[in-house]
Regions:
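C-terminal motif of bacterial Sec signal peptides marking the signal peptidase cleavage site
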Residues: 17-20
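Hydrophobic/aromatic-rich core segments of domains that either
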Residues: 181-252
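Short beta-strand elements that form the blades of beta-propeller/WD-repeat-like
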Residues: 280-282, 287-292
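Secondary-structure boundary elements
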Residues: 114-172
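Linear, non-domain "peripheral" regions
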Residues: 25-128, 195, 290, 296-303
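Short, mixed charged/polar active-site loops
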Residues: 221-223, 295-298
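Active-site nucleophilic cysteine motif
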Residues: 146, 150, 174-190
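Positively charged n-region of N-terminal signal peptides that target proteins for export
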Residues: 1-4
Length: 303
């Protein structure tokens, strides 16, 4: 009798272990999914694209986030969709290649990382952007206060990278960048808060390129150079915030263009002129208080 009980106990134990192993194996086989809560944004210079192009763009973005190998989109739009992906979607850095299917039914996507690592990187990016938004008081600041907060955060928290080709995705996660990736991250954070932002390619007299941003504040466009702010004062000031065409020229930028090679309209509003002489600044009661040379405080109303 004891022998029979022992055999039954052994069988029961083996069955329990088998079930446990089966459950464990099953969970390991379940594909990991990304936790992405950010908006699908795009450089404002492309605002006049047809809505069907933006729809296709969002479908590809979703596919990239979930590491899907195929996505059905109208391939006739794909050149413009790619332009949006390369200029406006930081997670495009996870993609190795896009290929139009032979039957034109959509595109195939290959990736730089396997599923688990891909998901980890998507989640890390999403988490970091949310952290930056929180640090910049996105939920309580006015739009213009938020722009100042983001500019200060970027210019004081991101270091210069030795890799001039670094992308905005790596800049967010590594905390280092080039003038172009600095500008891209600045623009991305503004667009997340529904603030019109444009990527700007500047050039000096020797035709050396430099990344800048433009953004609309109270329906007027201004230029921003967060990397030069970092290089010249560690991001402590606002010297290069809210600049005009004349300000750019005084800094050695002789020409500017959008990412689509279009030429911006004249930028000449001097609302933030006091920032060119900024010694220190603070935001108080919906005002930007700029202390200029000599200790005078200039008040700029914020909306």
């Amino acid at each position: 009798m004891k022998k029979i009980l022992s055999v039954l106990l052994a069988i029961s134990l083996a069955a329990t272990l088998f079930c446990a192993c089966s459950k464990s194996d099953s969970s390991n086989d379940t594909p990991q999914t990304a936790d992405f809560s950010l908006k699908y944004t795009y450089d404002t210079v492309y605002y006049d694209y047809d809505s069907s192009i933006f729809h296709a763009y969002e479908e590809v973005c979703k596919a990239v986030i979930n590491r899907e190998s195929d996505v059905r989109v109208n391939t006739g739009y794909f050149n413009k969709v790619q332009q949006l992906l390369y200029t406006s979607f930081p997670l495009n850095a996870l993609v190795q290649k896009y290929s139009v299917k032979d039957d034109d039914s959509g595109i195939s996507i290959s990736y730089n990382y396997e599923q688990a690592e891909h998901v980890e990187k998507v989640n890390s990016f999403n988490k970091k952007i949310l952290e930056i938004e929180k640090a910049c008081n996105i939920s309580t600041a006015s739009k213009e206060e938020y722009v100042i907060n983001v500019y200060h955060y970027i210019s004081s928290h991101i270091k210069q990278s030795k890799n001039v080709a670094i992308n905005s995705f790596d800049t967010v996660l590594k905390g280092e960048g080039s003038s172009f990736s600095y500008a891209n991250v600045f623009e991305y954070l503004l667009l997340q808060n529904d603030i019109d932002a444009y990527h700007i390619i500047g050039a000096d007299a020797s035709d050396v390129s430099w990344g800048l941003s433009a953004a609309a504040l109270d329906n007027k466009v201004y230029y921003f150079d967060p990397m030069t702010e970092f290089l010249n004062n560690g991001g402590k000031s606002l010297y290069y915030f809210g600049m005009t065409d004349a300000d750019l020229k005084s800094e050695g930028i002789k020409s500017v263009k959008f990412s689509n090679n279009g030429v911006p309209s004249p930028v000449n509003d001097k609302r933030f002129a006091a920032c060119r002489k900024c010694e220190k600044w603070e935001i108080k009661n919906r005002y930007l208080l700029v202390t200029v040379n000599g200790g005078k405080i200039v008040k700029i109303a914020l909306k």
